[in-house]
Design a protein with these regions (language model features):
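Active-site C-terminal subdomain of aminotransferase-like
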Residues: 27, 205-287, 301, 370-372
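PLP-dependent aminotransferase-like
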Residues: 89-156
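A glycine-/small-polar-enriched, mobile loop at the entrance of the PLP active site in fold-type I
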Residues: 15-66
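Active-site phosphate-binding strand-loop segment of PLP-dependent enzymes
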Residues: 22, 121, 132-188
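PLP-dependent enzyme catalytic core of the Aspartate aminotransferase-like
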Residues: 13-16, 329, 342-372
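Conserved PLP-binding catalytic core of the aspartate aminotransferase-like
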Residues: 296-327
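Conserved active-site segment immediately N-terminal to the catalytic lysine
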Residues: 181, 195-206, 215
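Conserved N-terminal alpha-helix of the aminotransferase class I/II PLP-enzyme fold
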Residues: 45-91, 98, 112, 120
Length: 372
């Protein structure tokens, strides 16, 4: 079920349907544009990979990327957009280093990444786990309507979409006036959001926006200051990057360039509202099949299902392994579940075409008929 694409000059490329959780599928239009500009970006005679980040040409690239992101997300003027490095995992430390003024924070534990963030925060202050879904292998989102928010908490932390377990916060927690910090790595730009409800929104781009190596952090300005925890390195202060337009040091220049192209692609698709509608249709195809299947079943409470990451199992580990192997041979790759949970997982990010999900479901139906 591989997609044969014209590679130019009579050549053909065989493209697979890539269901990887990250790094993940990117829009083909973006990849083709980048390929066309690889040796000569807009008459500069060089690749963006070779370009000085201090050049006017590159300044235009990063400025345009930020402007397009602000337009897509309708980011208020009192929020800074930072293009950072270090992966989302580095934010597990940067957040408490920069925000723990009272030395207290509340965490909602809905998966491995929220748990790791909580464990890291405990190195810097009192980090409270105020709700968790660990009791059911993170298969649901806890009720967050009336949480025991700490009176002196500096912030409340969530991982909004849980890549491994396939759950999503469809309603933000009531933080009782405390700043909400949200890791949106695997749902970034998949739907409209009201940025003003957050203190910090951040995420690694390698799932839904661009290549690995870039982290985007959107931070309310009142949370950015020199008053960080004692000993916070210069490079781990948000103010360092905010004061220098994300170019205190050399940024992940090529990654930001690709992100900028994805922002333009999203605008051409109709923006985030159109993207959410498209993602809902894709996810419905897969979830409807799982709900009716006699072999496969989903692992998440229905009301908390993610549109981006869909875990499923057969209930037999050998059969799971057989499915993953045969799917890969048919051109459906990276369907193996996270090493910590097993089973399968289809990550159907923005750039996954409807056709990819439809053909995956057709393959699953055929596999079911042959193995039930």
């Amino acid at each position: 079920m591989r997609q044969e694409k014209d590679a130019g000059k009579g050549g053909k490329n065989m493209r697979v349907y890539n269901f990887s959780a990250g790094p993940a599928v990117l829009p083909e239009e973006v990849l083709m544009e980048a390929a066309a500009e690889m040796l000569d970006y807009k008459g500069t005679g060089m690749s963006v990979m070779e370009m000085s980040h201090r050049s006017k040409a590159y300044q235009n690239i990063i400025d345009e990327a930020e402007a397009d992101l602000r337009e897509l997300m309708q980011i208020p003027d009192n929020y800074k957009v930072l293009f950072l490095q270090g992966g989302s995992s580095q934010q597990f430390a940067m957040i408490p280093m920069n925000l723990m003024k009272n030395g207290v924070a509340d965490y909602i534990i809905t998966g491995q990444w929220a748990r790791k963030a909580w464990q890291e925060a405990k190195l810097y202050g009192k980090a409270n786990a105020i709700a968790s879904s660990e009791d059911a292998t993170y298969s649901y989102i806890p009720n967050c309507a009336d949480l025991p928010i700490s009176e002196d908490a500096d912030y409340v932390y969530i991982c909004e979409n849980n890549t491994i377990y396939g759950t999503k916060f469809w309603q933000l927690p009531n933080t009782k006036g405390k700043a909400l910090v949200s890791d949106v790595s695997s749902c970034f730009l998949s739907e409209p959001v009201d940025v003003s409800q957050y203190g910090v929104i951040y995420g690694g781009v390698q799932k839904n926006i661009g290549p690995a190596g870039v982290v985007i952090a959107i931070i309310r300005e009142d949370l950015i200051s020199d008053e960080c925890l004692p000993g916070t390195p210069t490079m781990l202060k948000y103010k360092t990057h905010a004061d220098n337009g994300s170019m205190y040091n050399t940024p992940p220049a090529y990654g930001i360039y690709i992100c900028g192209k994805v922002f333009k692609w999203l605008k051409a698709q109709g923006g985030l509202a159109a993207m959410k509608a498209y993602n809902e249709k894709k996810a419905k195809i897969l979830y409807d099949f799982l709900d009716e299947s006699k072999l496969f079943k989903g692992t998440v409470v229905k009301k908390d299902r993610s549109l981006m990451n869909v875990p499923f199992i057969t209930g037999n580990q050998d059969l799971d392994a057989k499915f993953v192997k045969e799917a890969e041979a048919a051109g459906f790759v990276n369907l193996k579940g996270h090493r910590s949970v097993g089973g399968m997982r289809a990550s159907i990010y923005n750039a996954m075409p409807m056709e990819g999900v439809e053909k995956l479901v057709a393959f699953m139906k055929e596999f079911e008929e042959n193995n039930i």
